[in-house]
Amino acid sequence: MSVLPVVVVFGMSFPPIFIEIIVSLMLFWLIRRAITPTGLYDLVWHPALFNTALYCCLFYVVSRLFV
C-alpha cells in the first residue's frame, strides 16, 4: 500500500503511481538529453532497448524512493 494519497487534478483522480511515472519520465528525458551529445548511443547495440531499460531502472529507483 502506498503512503501517497490519490491526486485529484481538474476533477480527475490519479493513483499515486502516476506521480512516480511522471517523475521518472522527466528524469529519463533529462538523462537522455545529457547522453545524446556524448555519442554514447553510437556504442549501444539497440538504442530502443537501451532507452527502455534506462526508463525501467529509473522507474524502479523513483518508486523505491517514494515508498
Swiss-Prot record:
Gene Ontology terms: cellular component: plasma membrane
Protein name: Protein AaeX
Source organism phylogeny: Bacteria, Pseudomonadati, Pseudomonadota, Gammaproteobacteria, Enterobacterales
InterPro entries: DUF1656
Transmembrane residue ranges: 3-23, 43-63
Subcellular location(s) per record: Cell membrane
Pfam families, alphabetized: DUF1656 (PF07869)
Organism expressing this protein natively: Erwinia tasmaniensis (strain DSM 17950 / CFBP 7177 / CIP 109463 / NCPPB 4357 / Et1/99)
Keyword annotations: Cell membrane, Membrane, Transmembrane, Transmembrane helix
Family: Belongs to the AaeX family.
Membrane topology reported for the UniProt record: Multi-pass membrane protein
